[in-house]
Amino acid sequence: MTIAALIITYNEERNIERCIRSVLSFADEIIVLDSFSTDRTADICRSQGVNFIQRKWEGYSAAKNYLNEQCSSDYIFSIDADEAPNKEMQDHLVELKSGQMNGVYSVNRITNYCGKWIRHSGWFPDVKIRLFPRGS
């Protein structure tokens, strides 16, 4: 099974390199869709050797759907530019690839707000579907 990491960006020069590096161990293809950032996002992405596409912003769902159409992998790992899976999750995804992947996978996301991890008030776990078959 193959996995594509799909990332949407706009002015993410502070985050995008960390995000890209965090998916290298398990992603067979990395595609970044950028809405014509005015910072160094494009330069950073190109230096990382990812498939970098610039396109006018037409909304979140339209961007995600467009990205899904651009990849050729069996599974899609959808990640935000300011996110990065930790080592444990990276290792789990590598292991998952070597076995039988079946269905949709979710992650428990933890939010960092103003430098503090939010673990209360219904903010954690923030369950998000992040890995799913292409075309689903």
Question: Which residues fall in each region the model found?
Answer:
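N-proximal low-complexity "stem/linker" segments adjacent to membrane-targeting elements
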Residues: 1-22
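Acidic helix N-cap motif at the loop->helix transition within catalytic regions
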Residues: 17, 39-48, 88-89
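A conserved acidic beta->alpha catalytic loop
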Residues: 22, 34-43, 80
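Catalytic-site signature of metal-activated, phosphate-bearing donor transferases
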Residues: 61-68, 74-79, 86-136
